[in-house]
Protein backbone atom coordinates (compact mmCIF):
# COMPACT_ATOMS: atom_id res chain seq x y z
CA UNK A 1 0.00 0.00 0.00
CA UNK A 2 1.20 3.51 -0.78
CA UNK A 3 1.02 5.73 2.27
CA UNK A 4 0.15 9.42 2.22
CA UNK A 5 0.24 12.00 5.00
CA UNK A 6 -2.72 12.11 7.34
CA UNK A 7 -5.26 14.82 6.58
CA UNK A 8 -4.02 16.69 9.66
CA UNK A 9 -0.37 16.62 8.50
CA UNK A 10 -1.43 17.68 5.00
CA UNK A 11 -3.33 20.66 6.43
CA UNK A 12 -0.36 21.61 8.64
CA UNK A 13 1.73 21.76 5.46
CA UNK A 14 -0.65 24.24 3.82
CA UNK A 15 -0.29 27.96 4.35
CA UNK A 16 -2.52 30.94 3.66
CA UNK A 17 -0.73 34.24 3.07
CA UNK A 18 -2.45 37.64 2.96
CA UNK A 19 -1.28 41.13 2.14
CA UNK A 20 -0.39 42.75 5.46
CA UNK A 21 0.55 39.46 7.18
CA UNK A 22 3.81 39.38 9.10
CA UNK A 23 6.05 36.37 8.50
CA UNK A 24 9.79 35.92 8.63
CA UNK A 25 11.05 35.24 5.10
CA UNK A 26 13.37 32.51 6.38
CA UNK A 27 10.46 30.81 8.17
CA UNK A 28 8.58 30.85 4.87
CA UNK A 29 11.58 29.28 3.12
CA UNK A 30 11.80 26.53 5.78
CA UNK A 31 8.09 25.89 5.39
CA UNK A 32 8.43 25.59 1.61
CA UNK A 33 11.32 23.13 1.84
CA UNK A 34 9.43 21.02 4.38
CA UNK A 35 6.38 21.08 2.08
CA UNK A 36 8.48 19.67 -0.77
CA UNK A 37 9.36 22.77 -2.79
CA UNK A 38 12.78 22.98 -4.44
CA UNK A 39 14.84 26.15 -3.99
CA UNK A 40 16.00 27.46 -7.39
CA UNK A 41 17.43 30.69 -8.74
CA UNK A 42 14.44 31.30 -11.02
CA UNK A 43 10.90 29.94 -10.77
CA UNK A 44 9.82 28.56 -14.11
CA UNK A 45 8.07 25.31 -13.24
CA UNK A 46 5.75 23.95 -10.53
CA UNK A 47 7.16 22.90 -7.15
CA UNK A 48 9.95 25.51 -7.20
CA UNK A 49 10.57 28.65 -5.19
CA UNK A 50 13.23 31.34 -5.15
CA UNK A 51 14.19 34.24 -2.92
CA UNK A 52 15.89 37.43 -4.03
CA UNK A 53 16.13 40.14 -1.44
CA UNK A 54 12.64 40.84 -0.14
CA UNK A 55 10.91 38.91 -2.93
CA UNK A 56 9.83 35.27 -2.78
CA UNK A 57 8.51 33.52 -5.90
CA UNK A 58 6.56 30.27 -5.50
CA UNK A 59 5.06 27.99 -8.14
CA UNK A 60 2.35 26.00 -6.38
CA UNK A 61 0.54 23.29 -8.31
CA UNK A 62 -2.96 24.60 -7.65
CA UNK A 63 -2.32 27.73 -9.71
CA UNK A 64 -1.65 28.14 -13.43
CA UNK A 65 1.07 30.72 -12.82
CA UNK A 66 3.69 31.35 -10.13
CA UNK A 67 3.17 33.72 -7.24
CA UNK A 68 5.41 36.65 -6.35
CA UNK A 69 5.34 37.85 -2.76
CA UNK A 70 7.03 41.17 -2.05
CA UNK A 71 8.03 41.83 1.54
CA UNK A 72 8.70 45.08 3.33
CA UNK A 73 10.82 43.76 6.21
CA UNK A 74 8.59 40.92 7.54
CA UNK A 75 5.28 42.31 6.21
CA UNK A 76 3.73 41.08 2.97
CA UNK A 77 3.50 44.23 0.85
CA UNK A 78 1.82 42.64 -2.17
CA UNK A 79 1.05 39.29 -3.78
CA UNK A 80 0.69 38.80 -7.50
CA UNK A 81 0.62 36.13 -10.16
CA UNK A 82 3.21 36.53 -12.88
CA UNK A 83 4.10 34.99 -16.22
CA UNK A 84 7.01 32.62 -15.70
CA UNK A 85 8.48 33.40 -19.14
CA UNK A 86 8.21 37.19 -19.26
CA UNK A 87 8.17 37.82 -15.48
CA UNK A 88 5.33 40.33 -16.06
CA UNK A 89 2.49 40.72 -13.59
CA UNK A 90 -0.75 38.98 -14.54
CA UNK A 91 -2.90 39.84 -11.54
CA UNK A 92 -2.52 41.22 -8.02
CA UNK A 93 -4.37 39.34 -5.28
CA UNK A 94 -4.93 39.86 -1.56
CA UNK A 95 -4.54 36.24 -0.48
CA UNK A 96 -3.09 32.93 -1.66
CA UNK A 97 -3.05 29.37 -0.38
CA UNK A 98 0.10 27.30 -0.70
CA UNK A 99 -0.36 23.53 -0.68
CA UNK A 100 2.40 20.91 -0.43
CA UNK A 101 4.51 19.99 -3.44
CA UNK A 102 4.87 16.37 -2.31
CA UNK A 103 2.96 13.65 -0.54
CA UNK A 104 6.07 12.77 1.48
CA UNK A 105 5.18 14.95 4.46
CA UNK A 106 5.94 14.40 8.11
CA UNK A 107 6.37 16.39 11.28
CA UNK A 108 9.85 17.24 12.61
CA UNK A 109 9.03 15.76 16.00
CA UNK A 110 8.50 12.32 14.40
CA UNK A 111 11.94 12.10 12.78
CA UNK A 112 13.85 11.04 15.92
CA UNK A 113 11.60 8.05 16.53
CA UNK A 114 11.83 6.95 12.89
CA UNK A 115 15.63 7.32 12.86
CA UNK A 116 15.82 5.11 15.97
CA UNK A 117 13.68 2.46 14.26
CA UNK A 118 15.86 2.60 11.14
CA UNK A 119 19.07 2.27 13.17
CA UNK A 120 17.67 -0.68 15.16
CA UNK A 121 16.67 -2.44 11.96
CA UNK A 122 20.03 -1.55 10.40
CA UNK A 123 21.99 -3.14 13.27
CA UNK A 124 19.97 -6.33 12.99
CA UNK A 125 20.50 -6.61 9.23
CA UNK A 126 24.13 -5.48 9.42
CA UNK A 127 25.07 -8.35 11.75
CA UNK A 128 23.70 -10.92 9.28
CA UNK A 129 25.27 -9.33 6.21
CA UNK A 130 28.34 -10.47 4.31
CA UNK A 131 31.33 -8.18 5.05
CA UNK A 132 31.62 -7.34 1.35
CA UNK A 133 28.34 -5.37 1.45
CA UNK A 134 28.51 -3.78 4.90
CA UNK A 135 30.23 -0.49 3.97
CA UNK A 136 27.86 0.28 1.08
CA UNK A 137 24.83 -0.65 3.18
CA UNK A 138 25.93 1.56 6.07
CA UNK A 139 26.60 4.50 3.72
CA UNK A 140 23.16 4.17 2.11
CA UNK A 141 21.39 4.08 5.48
CA UNK A 142 23.30 7.14 6.74
CA UNK A 143 22.43 9.07 3.56
CA UNK A 144 18.77 8.06 3.92
CA UNK A 145 18.73 9.24 7.54
CA UNK A 146 20.24 12.61 6.59
CA UNK A 147 17.66 12.95 3.80
CA UNK A 148 14.83 12.26 6.26
CA UNK A 149 16.17 14.89 8.66
CA UNK A 150 16.39 17.40 5.78
CA UNK A 151 12.87 16.58 4.49
CA UNK A 152 14.33 15.53 1.14
CA UNK A 153 11.66 14.36 -1.28
CA UNK A 154 13.80 11.67 -2.88
CA UNK A 155 11.66 8.65 -3.80
CA UNK A 156 13.90 6.36 -1.72
CA UNK A 157 12.36 7.99 1.37
CA UNK A 158 9.07 6.18 0.72
CA UNK A 159 10.76 3.00 2.00
CA UNK A 160 10.58 4.50 5.50
CA UNK A 161 7.28 6.33 5.26
CA UNK A 162 5.30 3.55 6.95
CA UNK A 163 7.36 4.12 10.11
CA UNK A 164 5.79 7.54 10.69
CA UNK A 165 2.72 7.74 12.93
CA UNK A 166 0.82 10.35 10.93
CA UNK A 167 0.40 8.48 7.67
CA UNK A 168 -2.67 6.90 6.17
CA UNK A 169 -4.11 5.76 2.86
CA UNK A 170 -5.90 7.90 0.30
CA UNK A 171 -9.28 6.57 1.46
CA UNK A 172 -9.11 8.83 4.52
CA UNK A 173 -9.26 11.85 2.22
CA UNK A 174 -12.49 10.85 0.50
CA UNK A 175 -14.87 12.40 3.01
CA UNK A 176 -12.77 15.48 3.69
CA UNK A 177 -13.27 18.84 1.97
CA UNK A 178 -9.50 19.13 1.52
CA UNK A 179 -10.03 17.24 -1.74
CA UNK A 180 -11.38 20.43 -3.23
CA UNK A 181 -7.75 21.61 -3.26
CA UNK A 182 -6.54 18.65 -5.26
CA UNK A 183 -7.23 18.34 -8.98
CA UNK A 184 -7.55 14.66 -9.79
Regions found by a protein language model. Name each.
Residues 1-182:
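ASCE RecA-like P-loop NTPase motor cores
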